[in-house]
Amino acid sequence: MSFGHKIAQTVLGLASAADKLQPWTFRPLPVGDVKPAGWLLGEMQAMATGLPGHEHDFYIFVNQSSWLSTPGSGGSEYSNLNEALPYWFNGLVPTAYILDDDRLKGQVHDVADKVLSFQTDDGWIGPETGDKRNFWARTPFFLGLIQLAEADNQWEQRIVAALQKFFQLGNKMLHNGSQGFTRCASDVDCTWGEVRIADMIITIQWLLEKYPSNNDSQLWDTMNMFYDQTNYKWDTWYDPATYRKVVDPSDKTITPYIHGVNVGQGLKASSVMWRFKGGDYFRQRSKNAVDLTFTYHGSASGSILADEWQRDDSQYIGSELCTAVETSYSLAYMYQVLGDNNYADRAETAVTCRHQTCLLRGVATTYGMEPLYPCCTVNHPQGYPKFVTNSWVSVGSKGLGHALLGPTNVNTKVNGGDVSIECTTNYPFTNSLSYNIRASKDFDLYLRVPEWMNLHTSSLAVTRSAAGKASATATMAVEASDDTGMQKIPISQGTTTLSYSLGVGPRVEKLADNTVAIFWGNLLYALDVGYTSTTSLPHSYGDPRGPGISGLPFKELRDEFVNSTKEWNVAIDPSTIKYNGIGASDSMPNPIFEHNAPANFMTVDGCQIKWDLKMGVTPDRVPTDRTCTSERKTYRLIPYGAAKVHMSQMPTVQL
């Protein structure tokens, strides 16, 4: 019996009937129940053997962090927020356990043991002392801790006890004039903890659900104070009547709301609040958050347009890797809480499109080891493992659902029995998924039907095998039963195979300035503008134009500078698109997102147009004059993640 079950048996029912969290639409599975397969396994292995898996070996903001020494004794940090090690830990915990990598587990255990051993007598966790204490950096570290407790029961009791002790102190701090939350030392910026407080509340709700105790009423009080005291409430920001469709980054009164990473995290804030406040208001504001953000500040690749700060929908605005991973996690969380199929579609797109574009061979971000600022270096490892963990969900009392489609294997308990499912697929590069299912008891399987899918050209075939009986195959119509997009398939005890074919074709999405983005399924395609690169020693974020950092222990650490080699100023005629795909059983290159590695491509006719550069560097807003300045030509479109220089929002012309 686990520690959590012992606790639950002794104190169950102590909380007030009114103090009850709103239920998940789909409950998340414990970390480690879901493993990557196929191309997704290759990508995660590249992360483990590349930069994320070696930061603990050389990166001073990780292995010399102030978190690993006695509080107040100092260490290496890129800011006094002390967030580097917590960011890294939040991503490395699930990576280590999903891959069952003993080397990475050793790193995680070493850090967890040191940090928890330094917990102070009054409950504080972290390197700060006195008035330097503030809540923010604990948020990602605690998300790492709860994942470790789920993945490894040897850590469960120690972690739960440490968190419960911390939140007793946290409650006192909030009652003491919002100490460390809205009231910090003059040189500590409180706003990061305020605007991102929903992620801290997730840890509190995890404790309430899994480890009820005599302190539950205090935890509820803490959640309510966090919401009441913060000066930055995402539900009020996402009021359609006042939402800023175009923003001025110099307006300091709204800076926390327009920071790209904050927005990525803030998407789920109203969903987190709904879980303990209930009511239609927070559900609607959750929907507003997604609709307004992606309508006015969203990228076709699934992330948020913000060169750190939002501005408008100009095509030249980029997006941090941090923003992409936080956005995908928020959308996956929102799908589990509220069940809107659109959230799951968007979570898939953010990972399979935007996440890849910022990586080269899993070794470094596109522009370097720590381009301009180190936060993405330490924060990006959470992207893939959280996508894998959240790809399967528990449905009701006897169901298991495939929420985020892709090549994964799951081993878990459903309806009191053991269930093992292997999903073999090249999705999203192909449109078919094959499931091999073994179950010790009957259960209900749920498969998500994406909103963009053509139901008329989709199919399901189920083959059931039972001891001593011949296999029987039945076909089913594909249909989503409700807004969740889930289709229910009863599965009998024994062995079952299932073939799921998604109706897919080229999809044209209209964007600002009479431009379009081209998809096949949820996979965005970009104009192939060629690719050339040069490398150098990695540069310090504080000296990006200097000679680079020598003496690092890994020769693989390089900054890579990329450029295009073909014309980019192209307008296309979408009516001429032709798709060239691969077979369901075709082998996939590893790594899959190298330039031109995927065999999938499209062709489209177009021509060059006059199109100016902004600041002489990047394409400006698309011109209204689409007069061809060249002859008609057939161009090649390739998966966005494999195009290291991107032209995916393209003007149209009728040829």
Model region roles, listed by residue range:
Residues 3-102, 131-154, 194-213, 250-294, ...:
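Aromatic (Trp/Tyr) and acidic
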Residues 70-78, 86, 95-237, 241:
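Extended ligand-binding groove/face enriched in aromatic
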Residues 234-259:
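A surface-exposed regulatory interaction patch that couples sensing to output
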Residues 286, 345-348, 353-433, 501-655:
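C-terminal beta-rich recognition modules with glycine/proline-rich loops and embedded aromatic residues
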Residues 440, 494, 521-523:
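Tight coil/turn sites that cap or link beta-strands
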Residues 443-446, 488-510:
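C-terminal beta-strand-rich structural cap/linker in extracellular carbohydrate-active enzymes
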Residues 455-490, 508-511:
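Solvent-exposed beta-strand/loop surfaces of large extracellular or lumenal domains
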